[in-house]
Regions:
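A residue-level marker of the well-folded mature domains of exported/periplasmic proteins
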Residues: 2-13, 21-366
Length: 366
């Protein structure tokens, strides 16, 4: 069951391999759309001659289905967790509707948990981190067995987390923006790796020297860590970061498209080599802007490995890489930790990292 913080049911659909874009560059969440983003970007700009080929879906375009979680996954404990009674689990997030990656991870978790007989309620506070406190308190008052805080900035959830601790209700982090008192464990990806590998894809293409613009978001710790790692690698290779732009997660694609459009006017051909974006929804806006301006000499990279990103990377155009976070494994690992806890096994670590994969045109459809 899903609801927004005011109990209005959310209905959000994300395309599985190609998405369409609105005129402002935001994602049009229509899973029936088949028009590739590069085609749409070109036609919106009144230019059908963009040099990047239209994205073609990879051979399988069906939506991903969560694999059933083992009783204990990713070497959680000794791997012999006994079956637990069905649980009531509240999944609370400020980012379910706003971020495709959050939706994918939460949907995987919900599917895996329900396959194990648990009841899951998903609550979206619509980009409002502060509202998470009230939602955690509400979940506590409803007597749920466990709470999952997914994405968001848990340092802002202090009051709600305190209520959960007082009620002895365990709270688990699903790719949250770091740890906070009251969260037993956070299952995530090594964000330093994500930043370095997405930056390395650019370095491999342009070599030492050159110029890059970066779209980051410091308030969310995972993206901040990615950006710090990427910037350090760029600067270590003599690449100048000429623009360091704070993105907008509430309108990731539209904001990035507008910001990069301005950059392209500021930096004529030959003065900007690449754009690094800390998450795919922003990379999509940057990519769209380069297509619309016929500036496909500028490389783009993203992070998350969303289906729309992989579809574009597969074309061999100027969106050259994304780094795929394994949301399925992140979700099933989270479930394994929850079930282990209720079988009497405390998490051995406060952070569990799940490996990520660099996606380029060579492996995008494999």
């Amino acid at each position: 069951m899903k609801r927004t913080s005011n109990w209005i049911a959310a209905s959000i659909v994300v395309a599985t391999c190609a998405v369409t874009l609105t005129a402002t560059g935001s994602i049009n969440a229509d899973d029936t759309a088949t028009t590739p983003t590069s085609e749409v970007a070109s036609s919106e700009a009144g230019d059908d001659s963009a040099s990047t080929p239209a994205a073609q879906p990879c051979p399988s375009t069906s939506a991903p289905v969560a694999t059933e979680a083992p009783a204990s996954s990713n070497d959680v404990g000794d791997g012999t967790v006994e079956a637990v009674e069905p649980l009531e689990i509240a999944v609370l997030s400020p980012d379910y509707a706003a971020q495709p990656a959050a939706k994918e991870a939460i949907d995987f978790f919900e599917a895996a948990a329900e396959a194990h007989g648990h009841t899951v309620t998903v609550v979206d506070t619509n980009s409002d981190n502060a509202a998470m406190n009230a939602e955690i308190t509400t979940a506590v008052s409803q007597g749920v067995d466990a709470i999952v805080v997914a994405f968001g900035t848990p340092q802002e959830f202090g009051d709600g987390l305190a209520d959960a601790v007082e009620a002895d209700i365990p709270v688990f982090g699903l790719d949250t923006g770091g740890l906070a008192e009251g969260i037993l464990v956070n299952v995530t990806t090594d964000n330093g790796f994500l930043g370095e590998q997405s930056a390395q894809a650019i370095i491999d293409e342009i070599g030492e020297g050159g110029t890059v613009a970066m779209i980051h978001f410091d308030p969310f710790e995972p993206v901040r860590l990615r950006a710090e790692a990427a910037r350090a690698l760029f600067e270590g290779n003599g690449i100048e970061v000429v623009e360091y732009i704070q993105g907008d997660p509430e309108d990731s694609t539209g904001f990035a498209a507008a910001a990069v459009g301005d950059l392209l006017a500021k930096y004529p051909a030959g003065e900007l080599d690449a754009i690094w974006a800390g998450w795919d929804a922003s990379a999509l806006g940057a990519y769209q802007a380069t297509l619309a301006a016929d500036r496909t000499e500028i490389l783009v990279t993203g992070v998350d490995g969303q289906a729309f990103a992989i579809a574009e990377v597969a074309t061999g155009g100027n969106w050259i890489a994304t780094v795929r976070q394994d949301w399925d494994t992140i979700a099933t690992t989270e479930l394994g930790l929850i079930e282990a806890y209720f079988a009497g096994e405390e998490p051995a670590e406060t952070i569990v990292y799940v490996p990520a994969v660099v996606i380029t045109a060579e492996n995008a459809c494999t």
